[in-house]
Design a protein with these regions (language model features):
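Conserved short alpha-helical segments that host acidic/polar catalytic motifs at enzyme active sites
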Residues: 1-311
């Protein structure tokens, strides 16, 4: 249960101070989906910079220069201790003259298998998410083709954002949520993992952007937004994604709905325990959460119910 967030100010309407304010408010709103670590990526002085710490967003002190694109992530740890900062998002990589950063929301369970079958190098990074970086790196380029190659090999739940050192921003949409607003009047894209989080952040931001257009993405879509705000789409095959059962956030394994309660791993048990604890703040009992799981709802579905107040 992590959160992706960010903004692209392609008309450069806002100054550095205003962008720091926007990102600070947006990242704090994203704490609803993770407080173990926070990170951002941006381009400055011809170099892609990543700033991340094992801190909740409200404890971060951003000092972002006057840049156009900022990509962020708040983390709830499932695999890889957040105290080791290399496990936190975004992840940095270089392919020739291309620098890129990647952030992932979801849980992948075939990272160990992929590292063997794809003959990828071992790494000190412990998170399942990092396999996505390595799959792109193996293709020796960053484009629709390499992103599709990566996405079609991942088994689990995901939505992924990637930015490069030319201020191109990519969204790779799996089965996890993503909400993107385009404020064409002022020339800005703002996004977060859920519409509820994005709306709450926008309500708190002391600047008016005009009326947004929501950019619709389906599972299997890859969206590219370039530095000028131009959008381009591609697709990837979701057969592997849909072949696994839809328990979005259970670490390491996805298992069928009919057997889930009988075969929970310790990691799954801990995640459900945390979900129930969080649900109690909204007035939902443990029995209600169990009932929803028995009926086939995913943990992601239940999270959306909590944040959107529908049940």
């Amino acid at each position: 249960m992590c959160c992706l967030f960010g903004m692209l100010d392609y008309k450069n309407r806002f100054n550095a101070k205003q962008k720091n304010k926007i990102i600070s408010i947006l990242s704090v709103a994203c704490e609803a989906r993770g407080t173990d670590a926070t990170g951002i990526a941006y381009n400055h002085n011809g170099h892609l910079s990543v700033y991340k710490r094992p801190l909740a967003a409200h404890k971060m002190r951003f000092n972002i220069p006057d840049v156009n694109l900022i990509m962020g992530h708040t983390r709830m740890t499932t695999q890889g201790n957040e105290k080791y900062n290399f496990n936190n998002h975004p992840f940095y990589c270089e392919i020739g003259n291309t620098e890129f950063a990647l952030a992932h929301n979801g849980v992948l369970y075939n990272d160990i298998t992929l590292r063997k079958t794809e003959k990828l190098p071992e790494t000190i990074i412990e998170t399942d998410s990092y396999i996505a970086v390595q799959l792109i790196e193996k293709q020796k380029r960053l484009d629709f083709s390499s992103l599709g190659y990566m996405a079609e090999r991942l088994s689990g739940s995901f939505t992924i954002t990637v930015m490069d050192n030319d201020n191109n921003l990519y969204f790779v949409k799996g089965d996890n949520p993503m909400c993107i607003y385009h404020f064409k009047e002022v020339g800005i894209f703002i996004y977060a993992s859920t519409e509820e989080i994005l709306k709450k952040a926008l309500w708190r931001i002391p600047y008016r952007f005009g009326k947004p257009k929501k950019i619709e993405l389906e599972a299997g879509d890859i969206l590219k937004i370039d530095r000028h705000g131009k959008m381009e789409k591609s697709e990837f095959d979701t057969s592997l994604l849909s072949a696994v059962s839809y328990y979005s956030h259970f670490p390491y394994r996805h298992i069928s709905i009919s057997t889930e309660h009988k075969t929970k791993s310790p990691y799954q048990q801990e995640y459900i325990r945390q979900l129930k604890s969080h649900a109690s703040f909204y007035g939902y009992t443990d029995d209600m959460v169990d009932m929803l799981l028995d009926e086939g709802y995913t943990t992601d579905d239940i999270e959306e119910m909590l944040y959107c107040g529908v049940y």
